[in-house]
């Protein structure tokens, strides 16, 4: 059966729409570009081009995976974040646009003489690499508990030719020496309650639960980082963490309980509480 690019896109968009995809046009285009190994502009320039039988078979196989709910990023193996192409795998969370807000907040709070940033739970390396790409004189360290994630992040650094970042394996601060002090510590840790019904919906069904779910109503890892972060921050340094849209008020309270000052919450692009930060200052 011969199909043009235009006809194949139209048919697949209809199928994706019926299955409830919230971005059927984008999904279909990304999958077809991946199969054809062509940029998006190619689909617009050559809509009448006939797709080969082999290409059609490959496309239909990927489309079936998407129709079953598998995230596009896992199907094609990459996701763009902060304009950086990043390889992803089912061992890591898929980088999301909302997390770019954490990168923006970190960059906004860097002083001219800042030297080091620590990213905890780095996953694909998205946050660490985004910051490192903007500030090539900074030393950036990313930490993840999963060996596979650390190797993936290292690969993403090579792909993007970013040399001022280092990735280490370990649980939170475990691979960091107490003699190491940072201007800023950032993290997008697990913060979802295990009973949250959203865990059975959408892309998160396919993502590693260990990177999503935390005890104490989703606060356990946030609190752990807050407690121990004080030991690794320079005087006047900032801790900033991404969290759920309903956790901002409680998290500000926890920050203040732990002695941080200038505590505030920043909103994401949809106006929801997304990043809470506090400054650690020691009186001499």
From Swiss-Prot:
It is an enzyme of class 2 (transferase). Substrate binds at residues 188-191. NCBIfam families: hemK_fam, RF_mod_PrmC. HAMAP family: RF_methyltr_PrmC. The gene is prmC. This is Release factor glutamine methyltransferase. The keyword Zinc does not apply. It catalyses: L-glutaminyl-[peptide chain release factor] + S-adenosyl-L-methionine = N(5)-methyl-L-glutaminyl-[peptide chain release factor] + S-adenosyl-L-homocysteine + H(+). InterPro entries: DNA_methylase_N6_adenine_CS, HemK-like, Methyltranfer_dom, N5-glutamine_MTase, PrmC_N, RF_methyltr_PrmC, SAM-dependent_MTases_sf. Coiled coil: none annotated. PANTHER family: HEMK METHYLTRANSFERASE, MTRF1L RELEASE FACTOR GLUTAMINE METHYLTRANSFERASE. It comes from Aliivibrio fischeri (strain ATCC 700601 / ES114) (Vibrio fischeri). The keyword rRNA-binding does not apply. Methylates the class 1 translation termination release factors RF1/PrfA and RF2/PrfB on the glutamine residue of the universally conserved GGQ motif. Pfam families: Methyltransf_31 (PF13847), PrmC_N (PF17827). Belongs to the protein N5-glutamine methyltransferase family. PrmC subfamily. GO terms for molecular function: nucleic acid binding; protein-(glutamine-N5) methyltransferase activity; protein-glutamine N-methyltransferase activity. One of its GO terms (biological process) is methylation. Its EC number is 2.1.1.297. S-adenosyl-L-methionine binds at residues 121-125, 144, 172, 188. Keywords: Methyltransferase, S-adenosyl-L-methionine, Transferase.
